[in-house]
Amino acid sequence: MRRTVIRGRESMAKIKINMTFECLTWRQPVISSIIQKCVEATLTAEGVTAPCEINVLVTNDRGIHAINKASRDIDRPTDVLSFPMFQLEAGNLPEDWEDYLDPESGLCPLGDMCISLERAIAQAKEFGHTIRREVGYLTIHSMLHLLGYDHMDEGPQKEQMRSREEAIAAAISGMSRN
């Protein structure tokens, strides 16, 4: 399996995103661009003021299946996985991020996300919207997990997360449901 690593790109908000694409053919500027926009939009919407670092792996169903099995003992592929570095509380993030900063980089390592582009393409077709919107939505979903949101219940937690996902997506050009 060939891997391509795109060196971390820093935005003006001091966000470093380390993207790894497992297939050279998937090194699409549009995918990188929407991931970056959605990471930035989520951090802004959630009021994160710390300089952050996020690792993103874009893989296929086989790759995410292996990660899902190894990390969660779930023997099937999924669309996105999130691995937060810290246990944060959704909607109640720290005002002072000093204790979370890596002393070497000066950045807050929020965690890792894995996206199955193969699954995103299938879901975009299934839901009748663009691949761009699906990858963006999965990125926002994963970022919210890194920031302490969860949807394990069918009640308020899930509703809160869904509401945040839709609000953030609506604020990004090209991310509307249509």
Regions found by a protein language model. Name each.
Residues R2-G136, L144-N178:
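An acidic/histidine-cluster motif and surrounding catalytic segment
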